[in-house]
Design a protein with these regions (language model features):
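Patatin-like phospholipase
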Residues: 1-45, 53-267
Length: 267
């Protein structure tokens, strides 16, 4: 049941991975914003990291512009195959998507942002069976713009498609896509400190993964899940404006439905 504490509700919002299906989150944040639902913390992994920073910056109504800009390109399967209008994912994020982010608005926000990436262990640790480790980059208030950009690139740095042996280096440490260590960044903080944890997942696989890993939903914290009610029209590596519009609309409608059902629960 939704909480009613007579005080401001403390909420965490988690945006999952999903590659190009992440356009769904543009609709999610639009519905949350129109309902006036506020969050103290927003976490994101992979494409969800871009959703997290746009949401925290209050760029709700500009975020689809970044998705639309991608439609001037196709997704290259590898940097070796890049052309002027076909680019690998890291290039697209760095040069097409992130320039839409208003760093000043994000710095002025009182929302704490958590970005998940997967740290690559040394070869010696790999021999011991340790390949990746979850790592969070956190931002609130003043920060260096390049540090945020590096964190997002690390979180979105899918293996192979950005280069077979390539990775994103930050301070000498190598990182790959945050989804490799968990599709949903609910482990960014202790969820027990929140009244509500909202989880938006462009694929139901992420939610199933949470319960496989033993997510405890039995405490006082309420967990609210937003997942596609039907299959998203966009494939993970597909760039298509009409399908992006449909994915946005589905995210908008699904989130409105979740909000409405909660209002009915409270009478």
């Amino acid at each position: 049941m939704p909480v009613n504490l007579g005080r401001e509700v403390k909420r965490l919002l988690c945006y999952s991975s999903g590659a190009m299906r992440g356009v769904y989150y543009a609709g999610v944040m639009t519905a949350l914003d129109e309902a006036g639902i506020k969050f103290s913390d927003i976490a994101g992994v992979s494409v969800g990291s871009t959703a997290a920073v746009w949401h925290a910056a209050g760029q709700i109504h500009e975020v689809f512009d970044a998705w639309e800009a991608l439609c001037s390109y196709s997704l290259s399967p590898h940097p070796l195959f890049n052309t002027s209008r076909s680019r690998n994912l890291d290039w697209l994020i760095t040069n097409v998507s992130l320039p839409f982010l208003d760093m000043d608005r994000l710095k002025a926000s009182n929302i704490r942002v958590h970005i998940a990436a997967s740290r690559i262990f040394s070869p010696l640790n790999m021999l011991k069976g340790k390949v990746f480790e979850r790592r969070y980059f956190r931002f609130q208030g003043d920060f260096q713009a390049h540090e945020l950009v590096d964190a997002i690139r690390a979180s979105c740095y899918m293996p192979f498609i950005n280069g077979i042996f390539s990775s994103k280096r930050i301070d000498g440490v190598r990182y790959l896509d945050g989804g490799l260590t968990g599709r949903i960044p609910v482990d960014c903080v202790d969820t027990a400190v929140f009244d509500e944890v909202w989880i938006a997942a462009a694929s139901p696989k992420g939610v199933r993964e949470l319960f496989t890993l033993g997510l405890n939903t039995q405490g006082d914290t309420e967990f609210i899940f937003i997942v596609p009610s039907i299959a998203l029209p966009t494939a993970r590596g597909e760039i298509d404006l009409e399908k992006f519009k449909a994915g946005f609309q589905l995210g908008l409608e699904d989130t409105r439905a979740v909000i409405k059902s909660r209002e009915l629960d409270t009478g």
